[in-house]
Amino acid sequence: MISSFKRAAVLCALVACGANASAQDFPARPITLVVPFAAGGNNDVSGRIIAQKMGELLGQPVVVDNRAGAAGAIGASAVARARNDGYTLGFLSSGPLATNMSLYKTLPYDSTKDFSPVVKTTTSPSVLVVHPSVPVGNLKELVAYLKGNAGKINYGTSGAGSSPHLSAVLFESLAGVAMTHIPYKGGNQVNTDLLSGQIQLSFSPILEVVPHIQAGKLKAIAVTSATRSSLLPDVPAIAETLPGYEVITWNGVVAPAGTPPEVVARLNKAAVDAVNSPEVKTKLLQLGLEPAPSSPDEFLAFIKSEIGSFAKLVKLAGVEAQ
C-alpha cells in the first residue's frame, strides 16, 4: 500500500514538474492569433500591430490567421475548439464576445465558458454626428430639436442590432426622443447618405468621420464613451448631458478555456507591454482605437458586464435573435 502511495506521489510530482517546465519554456514555437474578420479592416490591422510587437517580446512569431464569417462566430468557434496550450489565441471584439450572445439563438461557443480571457487591448467610442442642415450646435440643442420634431429625423446604421443602432436606441431612451431608423447593409452607404443629407444623423466610428468633421461637412455633437475621448478631446461625452450613457466597441485577446494560468499570465504581460509601447500606442490611436490594457480577471469581468449591457440594449431595440 505504501509503495502504491509513493508511486502515485512521484507520478503527480513528475506531472506537476512537467507542467511547470512547459509553462516556463512557453512559447517554444510560433503562436497563431485568429482574427475572425477579413484582412484589411480595423480589427485585422490592429490585431497585426499588436501581434507583431507581442512576437518581438515573446521571442516567437505571433501569426495572424483570418477566419471571417458569421459575424465573427466562425473564428471565435475555432479558438474555442483549439488546444488549450496557449499556441492558438483569438483577437476578438465586442461583437463575437458580447453582442452575438443576444443576437443569435444558438452559437457554437459560450463567451463566458469557452475562453480564458487574456487581455482587453483597446476601446473605441462612436461619435454622434449630424448633417450641417440640422440647426443644432450641442447635445442639449439636439435633444430639444428632436423633441420638437419627433420621428422626422432619420438616422442611419450598418444594420439592426449593430453598435450604431444600439447607441441610438440608448440615446433615444435616456433623452426621451424618437428618431426614424434607416438600416443599411454596411457603413459606407451610411456615410454617403449622411454627407448628402438624405439622412441627418448617425453614430459613426471616429476614424470614418474625423476628416468630414474637420472639413465642415459634418458636425460632431458628442462621443459615446463615458468620458471624453483623447481622439476628439474637444467633443463632449453624451454622458455629460445624459448620465449613465455609454456604448463602446472593444477588442481583446482570449485563449481556449483551460489554458494554464502561467501561460495566460505570460501572454498577458506580453500583450500589455505591447499595447503600452509608444510605437504601438501611436499606431492604434491613428486607427481610432484607445489603448486600454487589462488583467485577465478584469477582462473576464468586463466581458460579463458587456454581455448584460448589450442584452438590455438588444431587448430595448426590439431586435429578435436569429
Task: Pin down the residues of each PLM region.
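Beta->alpha turn/N-cap motifs
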Residues: 90-96, 100, 157, 187, ...
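A ligand-binding cleft/hinge motif common to bilobed small-molecule-binding domains
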Residues: 96-106, 165, 170-174, 201-234
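N-terminal (or domain-start) structured segment
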Residues: 23-113, 152-154, 176-201, 293-294, ...
